């Protein structure tokens, strides 16, 4: 069980169990390859890497997954989905995602736990490398470089008007 606080300071106790994993699958949908919604299965070993990758780039998905996992606790606190999600932003999303990832490792049966832990560690390393590269590229930018103008340049006096010029042969 992992604890984190939302942006309102409310504490949440997250435990990934078969019941909470089933709630996530039943309550959260993501776009499938065909564009149609498909259940988000956080603990399916075949798609775990893809699921974690989706969570790491979608704060709203993190909030929805946490809501589904914590639904009984949310209800016990007299909150609805909107109130819960209103408390999920910034650092609380980061804390919730960290708790969720740690719970995925704990949830996984022992014989596969090392594999899941290694997967998450490798994803952390890759994300750090990619982030450092993006920061390096941003710092290497020069003012005005790569900025596309949306306006046309001012008309030049040497640009001829439409139609034949004085040097054009007569028809």
Segment roles from a protein language model:
Residues 1-7, 26, 33-54, 60, ...:
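Charged interaction scaffolds used for protein-protein
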Residues 16, 57-58:
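A generic short alpha-helical patch detector that favors 3-5-residue windows
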Residues 22-28:
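Covalent nucleotidyltransferase core used to form phosphodiester bonds in nucleic acids
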């Amino acid at each position: 069980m992992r604890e984190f606080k939302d942006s309102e300071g409310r504490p949440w106790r997250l435990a990934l169990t078969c019941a909470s994993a089933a709630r996530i699958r039943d309550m959260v949908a993501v776009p499938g390859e065909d564009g149609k919604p498909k259940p988000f299965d956080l603990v399916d070993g075949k798609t775990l890497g893809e699921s974690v990758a989706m969570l790491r780039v979608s704060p709203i998905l993190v909030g929805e997954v946490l809501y589904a996992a914590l639904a009984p606790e949310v209800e016990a606190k007299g909150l609805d989905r909107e109130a819960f999600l209103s408390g999920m932003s910034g650092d609380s999303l980061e804390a919730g995602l960290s708790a969720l990832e740690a719970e995925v490792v704990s949830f996984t049966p022992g014989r596969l736990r090392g594999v899941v832990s290694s997967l998450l560690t490798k994803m952390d390393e890759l994300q750090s490398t990619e982030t450092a590269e993006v920061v390096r590229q941003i710092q290497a930018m020069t003012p005005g470089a790569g900025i596309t103008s949306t306006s046309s340049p001012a008309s030049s006096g040497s640009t001829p008007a439409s139609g034949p010029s004085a040097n054009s042969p007569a028809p």
